[in-house]
Structures are given as C-alpha cells and as structure tokens.
C-alpha cells in the first residue's frame, strides 16, 4: 500500500468555510502540544457587561483558530485512517515525577571506567578436548574441568606430601569466600551512598531529641501496618494512637471535567485582577507577623534556658 501525504489546508475551505474567523491572528502556537497562547489584552467594557458571554466567545474563536492551524498541517494516510504530522514541541512541560537517579557504581565498575576496561561477552559453551563435545563454560559439567582429572602434573612449587586435589579445592573455596566479601562490601558502599544516615551514631542531646522522637514514631507507624491484616486485628497497647490514614493524593482542579466550575473560577480570577482595591488582607498579614515574632522570642527563651527571667525574679524578691 502506498502512503500519500496531502495538505489539509486544501480541504479546509470546503469543510469549514462557514466557521472561519475573520481578523488578525495574534495567537502563539505550539502545535506539537496542541496548544495556543493568547497574549492580547482583554476588553474591559465587554467583559464587565457580560463576563461569561465574553469569555465563551473569546475561547471559541481561539479554539477555532487552533483547529484551523492544525488543518494546515500535512496529513499522512495509513490503513487505520489519517494522521496529522505534528511539528516538534516548543513549550517545555514539567515532569510529573523527579528524574530517575543513576544506580551507584560498584568498586569494579568505577575502576573499569577509569582504566577504560570494556567487558567482553564470553561464550556460554566451550569445546571440551577430552570428551570432544561442546560443554558449558561455567557450572555443572563444565568443559575442561581440572577437578575431574584423575591425574595432575606436578609443579616446582608443590610441597612434599601435599594433596594437589585438596589444594585445588581449598583454592576454589578461598576464591568463593573472597568474592562474597567483595559483593557484601560493594552492597554496603552502595547503600551508604543512598542512605546518608547509615553508619552515623545517634546523638541523644537536646538538639536531636525531637528528630529521634519523630523517627521512632514513623518506624512505629510502619511496623503497625506490617502484618497481613495491616494491623486491623493486632492487640493495641494502652494509650496507643490510631495509625495515620493515608489517602490518595489528588491535584484539585486538574482534569476534573467540571466546565462550569472552571469558567466560574476563571471569571473570579479576572475580577480580582481588575479590582481597584488591594487584594492583600492586612489583618491576616499582621496576625502572621505577630505570631512569627512571638514564636521567635519563645525559641530564644528556650535556647537561653530562661536564666535571665530567673535572675530577674530573684532580684525582685
């Protein structure tokens, strides 16, 4: 099947002739994200006379301009239908979640990167000369296994009376134990990089007591939910607080689908922008400032230990 690319602007006038917008197009388009931005100023008189009608008319015209611009893009015909070839996105959209962190490198990976050593993939099968067949390179019944030989060549460094087979087995056990130690060391180093508190001794002075208490409460809350019933049928300790209820986080106003509520919120926002009165709540700001000062004075008294107050009281007596 041959793929044909046609220009949708050729059929735009035939299909949407009665819905085209007359006037200058001042929108900024990002067709890759299917969005358009209107930076023109609002007409205050029309907005104050009928806000809802003005917002609806402006939104309808802008959406129609966006659709008209989309129809000017080339279209690719495939078996399932027609596809518009969108350009590259120009507006950066923030990520929903943070960027994934790279996995910490092991000691060998860091050493190989410095030395420029590249890992070569070794074949899983190897030719066994004795049995004249291909066998696994490692593991059970591996090829050219020295341990299966009934005779071994003597070496100059062999000691008299030493069992070469026993020596070979001991060397293998030593290599395995050393490899396990290296794996454990790499695991500890990687976990130390991920958790900054690992390896640090706890300090029970006054400065760290609050942090230690909050950490213990978090650990206790996690332990209460670690059973199969999520702590529902566990025995409760005397004066034990209920476990915190963790609900689903929801971003209010995003994708709710309530068009009327969204338009009402937008109209309220525009009303606040065009208000002549100051939006700042002076009483609320004053109360917050006074509370901040009281909190700061209280923390200063706690840090000084209240020695000045005690000395003043003694002097008065």
Swiss-Prot record:
Top-rank taxon, per record: Eukaryota
Membrane-crossing segments per the record: none
Cellular component annotations (GO), alphabetically ordered: nucleolus; nucleus; preribosome, large subunit precursor
GO annotation terms (biological process): endonucleolytic cleavage in ITS1 to separate SSU-rRNA from 5.8S rRNA and LSU-rRNA from tricistronic rRNA transcript (SSU-rRNA, 5.8S rRNA, LSU-rRNA); ribosomal large subunit assembly; ribosomal large subunit biogenesis; ribosome biogenesis
Function: Involved in ribosomal large subunit assembly.
Homology family: Belongs to the RRS1 family.
The protein's name in its UniProt record: Ribosome biogenesis regulatory protein homolog
Organism from which the protein derives: Dictyostelium discoideum
Phylogenetic placement of the source organism: Eukaryota, Amoebozoa, Evosea, Eumycetozoa, Dictyostelia
């Amino acid at each position: 099947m041959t793929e044909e690319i046609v220009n949708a602007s050729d059929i735009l006038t035939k299909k949407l002739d009665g819905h085209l917008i007359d006037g200058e197009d001042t929108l900024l388009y990002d067709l890759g994200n299917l969005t358009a931005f209107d930076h023109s100023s609002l007409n205050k008189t029309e907005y104050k006379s009928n806000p809802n009608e003005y917002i609806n008319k402006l939104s309808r015209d802008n959406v129609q301009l966006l659709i008209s611009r989309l129809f000017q893009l080339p279209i690719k015909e495939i078996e399932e239908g027609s596809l518009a070839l969108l350009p590259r996105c120009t507006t950066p959209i923030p990520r929903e979640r943070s960027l994934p962190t790279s996995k910490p490198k092991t000691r060998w990976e860091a050493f190989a990167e410095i030395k420029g050593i590249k890992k070569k993939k070794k074949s899983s099968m190897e030719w066994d000369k004795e049995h004249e067949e291909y066998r696994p390179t490692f593991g059970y019944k591996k090829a050219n296994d020295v341990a299966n030989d009934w005779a071994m060549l003597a070496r100059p460094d062999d000691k008299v009376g030493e069992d070469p087979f026993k020596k070979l087995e001991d060397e293998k056990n030593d290599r395995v134990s050393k490899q396990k130690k290296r794996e454990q060391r790499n695991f500890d180093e990687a976990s130390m990089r991920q958790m900054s508190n690992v390896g640090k001794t706890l300090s029970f002075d006054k400065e760290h007591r609050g942090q230690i208490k909050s950490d213990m409460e978090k650990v206790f809350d996690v332990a209460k939910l670690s059973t199969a019933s999520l702590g529902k049928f566990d025995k409760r300790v005397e004066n034990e607080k209920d476990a915190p209820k963790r609900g689903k986080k929801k971003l209010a106003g995003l994708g709710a689908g309530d068009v009327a509520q969204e338009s009402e919120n937008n109209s309220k926002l525009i009303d606040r922008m065009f208000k002549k009165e100051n939006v700042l709540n002076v009483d609320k700001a004053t109360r917050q400032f006074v509370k901040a000062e009281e909190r700061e004075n209280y923390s200063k008294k706690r840090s000084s230990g209240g020695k000045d107050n005690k000395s003043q009281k003694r002097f008065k007596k």
